[in-house]
Curated annotation (Swiss-Prot):
Matches recorded under SUPFAM superfamilies: YefM-like
Signal peptide segment: none
Listed Basic residues bias regions: 1-11
Cited Pfam families: PhdYeFM_antitox
InterPro entries: Antitoxin_Phd/YefM, phD/YefM_antitoxin, YefM-like_sf
Disulfide bridge map: none
Organism domain of life: Bacteria
Protein name per the record: Putative antitoxin Rv0268c
Amino acid sequence: MGTRSKSRTRQLKQSNGCTATTSGASDRRRRARRRTAPAWLREDEWLRHHLPHPPRQLSRCLHRRRRSACHHRYSRRTPKGGLPMTSSLVPISEARAHLSRLVRESADDDVVLMNHGRPAAILISAERYESLMEELEDLRDRLSVHEREHVTMPLDKLGAELGVDIGRV
């Protein structure tokens, strides 16, 4: 940055008769511009791109975002109106080591395999899987019959039939 080519120095000598140097203020401004944001992200541009100003605050924002991301939204609490969750949460790394034990546990209870704090897969027993598939097939059959016959029913009756309290939803 501070070194000048020989040809440029020679040109300055010839034009003035002595060595000319650029003012220190312009050099400082040029260096300061390099240290800050790129030209397309100056002053009001920071707001348009939703970046913090000055640039040194960016690392703090990322740190805060990282910290909040570790509190995953999948907790053992049940959502309003949902069924209680009676499954055990197991990290995938532990599941690799104890797969046979987890398969035995899945006969009694569902096992949720977690990857980085988020549910990745659910291990259920073969009987439960078959019953869920049968129930799904029955519901699809009922839906196709209702669609063919254009049957309508009140929402309260439908909620009672499905076992859902419509007033709470």
